[in-house]
Structure formats: C-alpha cells, structure tokens
UniProtKB/Swiss-Prot annotation:
Keywords: Metal-binding, Nickel, Zinc. This is Hydrogenase maturation factor HypA. It comes from Wolinella succinogenes (strain ATCC 29543 / DSM 1740 / CCUG 13145 / JCM 31913 / LMG 7466 / NCTC 11488 / FDC 602W). HAMAP family: HypA_HybF. InterPro entries: HypA/HybF. Ni(2+) binds at residue 2. The gene is hypA.
Length: 119
C-alpha cells in the first residue's frame, strides 16, 4: 500500500512546516486529492490515524478535498469537466482523445497550527 509512504511524507511535511512556523502542534491537515490520483481516500485516512500518533499531528484532523478530473482538448484547447463516464471526446468540438490536465494531483493544501507558548 503506497498510502503508508504517502502519509509518512505528508507527516514529514507537517513537521517541517510546524518547526519553521514555531508551532507546537498541527490541528488540521487539508489535502487535495485528485479522483484519478490512484490514492484511496479511506486507506489514506486510516494510515494517517495510525502514523500521526507519534508526531506533531497527533491531535490533528485530516480533511481530504477531492479534485475532479479536468480535460483539455488537443484540437480546440477547450477545458472541461467530464459529464458521466464518456470522456473520450471533447465536449465542445467532439475531437477524440482529450488530455487529462486535472484530477491526478495530490498535495498538501493547508495546515492549521497552534503556536508555541512564548516565555
């Protein structure tokens, strides 16, 4: 399951951001996840719940924002979101084989952190 390695990298990113912002903990982690990213949201959530326990994210909530597929026509350049399961042609000019330009991504969208107490 590659979700484990993804969560490990995600937690490392969170640790780095918390350290550079002098935060004592991360309370919310928001991830953008394309519907064609190849990552299972439920497995990602499960792995996060287990791996976060020994990190700055121990008490954090994981929010996954699903990003839809987006296509660009190779002929007319139109960008569109597919309607239904037939996305083999441009919805504007009907040319075949549009390019998938969105929905494959996965990235850290935002973090909510709690600052260290100043003393």
């Amino acid at each position: 399951m590659h979700e484990y390695s993804i969560v490990t990298a995600l937690l490392e990113l969170c640790e780095n951001h918390a350290k550079s912002n002098k935060a004592k903990k991360v309370t919310k982690v928001v991830v953008a996840l394309g519907e064609r990213s190849g990552v299972e949201p439920q497995l990602l959530e499960s792995a996060f719940e287990v791996f976060k326990l020994d990190s700055v994210c121990a008490e954090s909530e994981l929010v996954i924002e699903t990003k839809p597929m987006k296509f660009r026509c190779r002929s007319c350049g139109a960008e569109f979101l597919p309607k239904g399961i037939d996305f083999g042609s441009c919805e504007v000019c009907k040319a075949p084989n549009p390019e998938l330009v969105g929905g494959k991504e996965m990235h850290l969208q935002s973090l909510e952190m709690e600052a260290e107490d100043e003393g």
